[in-house]
C-alpha cells in the first residue's frame, strides 16, 4: 500500500488551487478568520496531490466521521491525513484509488 506525502508553506499571498470546489470555499467561510487560510491551503495541497496522482480535477466532497476525522465521502478514494506545524502544512494520502 503506497503512502504519498506533500508539504507546503502557508502563504496568504500565493494563489489557491483552482481545483477547490465551491462547497470547499463555503466551508472555509464558516470558520474563524484565522483558520480560513490554513483550511484552504491544506485543501489546495490535497487537491493538487489528487490531481497529480489520479487525475482528479476537483477536490471531492469531504465529510467528517463520528470521531471528527475528515474523509472523502466516496469510499473508493484513499484515506488522507492533514497536519500543521507553524506555517507548514503536510498532507498524506494512504492507499490507492479503489475500483468499485
Write out the residue ranges for each language-model feature.
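Core catalytic alpha/beta fold that binds nucleotide/phospho-ligands
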Residues: 1-99
Amino acid at each position: 500500500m503506497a503512502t504519498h506525502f506533500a508539504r507546503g508553506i502557508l502563504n496568504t499571498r500565493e494563489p489557491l488551487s483552482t481545483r477547490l470546489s465551491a462547497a470547499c470555499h463555503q466551508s472555509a467561510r464558516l470558520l474563524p478568520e484565522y483558520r480560513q487560510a490554513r483550511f484552504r491551503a491544506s485543501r489546495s495541497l490535497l487537491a493538487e496531490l489528487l490531481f497529480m496522482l489520479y487525475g482528479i480535477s476537483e477536490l471531492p466532497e469531504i465529510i467528517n466521521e463520528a470521531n471528527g476525522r475528515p474523509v472523502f465521502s466516496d469510499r473508493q478514494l484513499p484515506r488522507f491525513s492533514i497536519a500543521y506545524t507553524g506555517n507548514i502544512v503536510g498532507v498524506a494520502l494512504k492507499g490507492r484509488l479503489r475500483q468499485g
